[in-house]
A protein has these predicted regions:
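Entry/capping segment at the start of metal-dependent catalytic domains
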Residues: 1-40
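Long, charge-rich C-terminal accessory regions
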Residues: 252-429
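Short secondary-structure capping/turn segments at boundaries of alpha-helices and beta-strands
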Residues: 16-20, 47, 86-87, 244-247
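C-terminal non-catalytic accessory extensions
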Residues: 422-474
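Short strand->helix junction
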Residues: 18-20, 73, 179
């Protein structure tokens, strides 16, 4: 079958990780299943583990959640270079839509960083060869807000609707016995996709077709400030993660971001304050604002599959159910249209946004910039070179990050290729990571959790494993 004829497929996937930071923590386990466009499973389930390198210790809290120890990952896993290659092979099958649950904010960032550390293009998998990505978390939020019929919506302890995968599966009678095992979460995500597709087929098809930025662009009319309904976790569960918004302007530097006003908010700051005061207030944490109204502005990134729809998609009875005051939103829209000078103010907020302070650590430098075509081509040569021949590889890179990435890549994945001077350099790097201060606070955290889980033999065994692992590698 030629690429052009490749049937569209969904690749449902999930990572379990050794910590919450996509760049500085490491993956533990990856799972994926390919389905056809009706969500029938068509491929073998893929599950593999990643061996942690010897310059990293897992976050204890993450191991408490996943139950995966570094010893288990080391025993069952492949090195990160091989781990990245396997994932890249799955993700780059033409016409694949890579889908997960909260993947836009988390798993996709893990993928980008794994690919960045291992010389694969961090972005191409999600757009080349008619590929795309999609996130079921916002689909569930949209379904609850816009068309809730046909699905049971569980509540959390605070009485708010819960969108945690394990809560939704339980409420809807879906088998999900081993939450936080990557494969169990993948099966659960497929089941949720089927549930929404069957309960609300029109909404489902609409959201699926509007996952691309090209399609979303057709909804956004900045000159008219055309109102839209927008679903986002940023709005908070207390109003169903939903509001009516209007586009004020495109972001001055990021062509994938549109500056939206939350019409349900208090727009007085936009009218009364200058751009410097607005910027300061926008970047002040909510809990420090006191009685001051927040700036009701948010960026919507059209390359992150945001949920946007025509304003009338939010029916009056659903707006009432979510506690959204339609008249207040309409009044705000009228005022904003009468005060177009607000547009320049909000553009000015973002034209001099918070400065991006680059990290000294190359692992955290993915977003410092794109690699040139020449560097990309050179990185492909690295991937095609036998590990044992890497030391003799004579290529120069323009981007300063790549030499450091290359050294880390060899030291973490192929330590046998380091000469004596390089081994000393790596040892020094590990000493810089595992300072006495770091190790003391790590031991303290393990002790604190150990007493917290008194009487829980399973959790305490995990903590003992972490303590042993730290002693082994440091």
């Amino acid at each position: 079958m030629s690429d052009s004829a490749a049937r569209p497929t969904f690749l449902f996937h999930d990572y379990e990780t050794f910590g919450t930071h996509p760049a500085l923590d490491r993956p533990a386990q990856f799972a994926a299943i390919r389905t056809d466009d009706e969500f029938n499973i068509i491929g073998e389930p893929e599950v593999f583990y990643c061996k942690p390198a010897d310059d990293y210790l897992p976050q204890p809290g993450a191991v408490m959640v996943t139950g995966i120890t570094p010893q288990e990952a080391r025993e069952k896993g492949v090195n990160e270079a091989e781990f990245a290659r396997r994932i890249h092979d799955l993700f780059t099958v033409p016409n694949t839509c890579v889908v997960g649950y909260n993947n836009i904010r988390f798993d996709d960032e893990v993928t980008r960083n794994v690919f960045y550390r291992n010389f694969y293009d961090p972005y191409a998998w999600s757009w080349q060869n008619r590929n795309s990505r999609w996130d079921l978390l916002d689909i569930m939020r949209a379904c609850y807000a816009l068309r809730p019929e046909g699905i049971n919506w569980p509540e959390n302890e605070e009485g708010l609707t819960s969108f945690r995968l394990e809560h939704l599966t339980r409420a809807n009678g879906i088998e999900h016995s081993n939450a936080h095992d990557a494969m169990a979460d993948v099966y659960a995500t497929i089941a949720m996709a089927k549930l929404v597709k069957n309960a609300q087929p029109r909404l489902f098809e609409y959201l699926l077709s509007h996952r691309s930025k090209q399609k979303l662009m057709t909804l956004i009319d900045v000159p008219q400030m055309k109102p839209l309904v927008h679903i986002s976790g940023m709005f908070g569960a207390w109003r169903g993660n939903t509001s009516w918004v209007a586009p004020l302007a495109w972001h001055p530097d990021n062509r994938n971001a549109v500056i939206m006003v939350d019409l349900a908010g208090d727009i007085s700051p936009l009218l009364e304050l200058d751009s410097d005061s607005l910027r300061e207030r926008l970047y002040t944490p909510k809990n420090e604002l006191g009685d001051l109204p927040a700036v009701p502005v948010k960026l919507v990134h059209i390359n992150k599959c945001p949920v946007l729809a025509q304003a009338n998609t939010l029916r009056p009875e659903d707006a009432d159910r979510l506690g959204i005051n339609r008249q207040h939103c309409l009044d705000n829209l009228k005022v904003l249209r009468e005060n177009p000078q607000v547009r320049e103010k909000v553009v000015a907020i973002f034209a001099e946004a918070e400065p991006f302070v680059p990290s000294e650590n190359v692992d955290a430098q993915l977003y410092n910039g794109f690699f040139s075509d020449a560097d990309r081509a050179a990185m492909n040569i690295v991937l095609q070179t036998e590990p044992r021949n890497l030391p003799a590889l004579d290529i120069t890179f323009a981007d300063k990050r790549i030499e450091k990435l290359m050294f880390n890549y060899r030291a973490r994945n192929f330590p046998g290729t380091l000469d004596e001077a390089e081994q000393d350099r790596w040892l020094q790097h590990r000493r810089n990571v595992f300072t006495q201060e770091f190790l003391n606070s790590y031991a303290q955290e393990l002790e604190m959790l150990y007493s917290q889980y008194e009487g829980n033999a399973e959790k305490q065994a995990l903590l003992k494993s972490l303590f042993q692992y730290a002693q082994e590698i440091v």
